[in-house]
Amino acid sequence: MTDQHLEDLIVHIVTPLVDHPDDIRVIREETDQKIALRLSVHKSDTGKVIGKQGRTAKAIRTAVFAAGVQSSKKVQFEIFD
């Protein structure tokens, strides 16, 4: 799965969870050893993406890591305001 597919996967997972899908942004920073994907959503949607006790965020992170296994680079995923 390519980097762009990882970004598309994140958007696909997060879109049904938020009230402001137009404010979803996935920023990719890539180095020789890792791919860092940072998710930004509307301020009022942050809690929905994180979920109770971080369960939703953990599930998204697990899906992204599983999809990124084919890459030779380490995948890092963060949610920020």
From Swiss-Prot:
Subcellular location: Cytoplasm
Broad class of the protein's primary localization: cytoplasm
Keyword Chaperone found: yes
Gene3D superfamilies xref list: 3.30.300.20
InterPro entries recorded: KH_dom-like_a/b, KH_sf_prok-type, KhpA
Domain KH: 34-81
GO biological process, one term: regulation of cell shape
Keyword Chaperone among record annotations: yes
A Pfam family: KH_KhpA-B
GO cellular component terms given for this protein: cytoplasm
Quaternary structure note: Forms a complex with KhpB.
Family: Belongs to the KhpA RNA-binding protein family.
Role according to the record: A probable RNA chaperone. Forms a complex with KhpB which binds to cellular RNA and controls its expression. Plays a role in peptidoglycan (PG) homeostasis and cell length regulation.
Protein known as: RNA-binding protein KhpA
